[in-house]
């Protein structure tokens, strides 16, 4: 019986010892409905939701990449920098700068959950992170590298640049958009009554649309589209190298 008890205690202690260190950062800051939010991060996730309050709630969960001493050291040096003015908030993930002792190990992961006024403007820069934005009714700018972007129930002007990533969007209405993609894909769902002017240029890629459009092939690897949908309206521009554009309609 004793060996079994000792083994159980040792196993429990080992499980506790190998848990990856975590910490959280949380703040609530006044932000008017016409304010702006800028977020810059690397390695993690961003979850943006909206409400009608004149404030922004920020929650960041930080987790070490592993349990090795170099991973833990990097985790200890990782912080979230939050600055604000009367109508703007800046959020930036801060990782340890390069020194001889930070050569080994991996940076910590930071997962953001943020709720802000639905009409606040957003600018997001991310590398190797997933981005989910829901309910924003204002301008959104996103630059992503090696990431995934999903937009749902958004209704503001959009500007998205993606390198080696995918972008999906379900738009409540359309007020203009520009997408630039390299080795990525864009799958966009719009109301069937949406009126817009599509300008698409895809090299070594493809363009597919539920909306009636004349798709022109300039050679085997160059696809262009320039046409109006439902009488025309705000511009939808898509520029891609080795990327795919898919436009779907919804009732």
Describe these PLM feature segments.
Residues 1-251:
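Intrinsically disordered, low-complexity terminal regions
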């Amino acid at each position: 019986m004793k060996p079994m008890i000792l083994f159980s205690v040792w196993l429990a202690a080992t499980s506790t010892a190998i848990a990856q260190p975590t910490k959280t950062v949380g703040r609530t800051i006044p932000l008017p409905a016409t304010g702006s939010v800028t977020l810059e991060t690397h390695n993690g996730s961003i979850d943006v939701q909206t409400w009608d309050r004149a404030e922004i709630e920020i929650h960041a969960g930080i987790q070490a990449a592993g349990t090795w001493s170099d991973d833990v050291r990097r985790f200890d040096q990782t912080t979230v920098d939050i600055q604000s003015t009367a109508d703007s908030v800046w959020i930036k993930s801060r990782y340890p700068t390069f020194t001889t002792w930070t050569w080994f190990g991996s940076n910590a992961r930071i997962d953001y959950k943020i709720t802000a006024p639905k009409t606040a403007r957003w600018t997001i820069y991310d590398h190797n992170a997933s981005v989910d934005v829901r309910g924003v009714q204002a301008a959104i700018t996103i630059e992503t590298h090696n990431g995934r972007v999903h937009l749902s129930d958004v209704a503001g002007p959009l500007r998205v640049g993606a390198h080696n990533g995918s972008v999906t969007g379900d738009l409540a209405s359309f007020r203009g958009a520009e997408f630039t993609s390299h080795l990525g894909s864009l799958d966009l769902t719009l109301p069937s009554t949406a009126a817009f002017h599509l300008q698409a240029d895809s090299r070594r890629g493809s363009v597919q649309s539920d909306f009636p459009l004349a798709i022109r092939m300039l050679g085997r690897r160059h696809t262009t589209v320039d046409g109006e949908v439902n009488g025309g309206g705000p511009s939808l521009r898509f520029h891609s190298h080795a990327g795919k554009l898919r436009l779907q309609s919804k009732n």
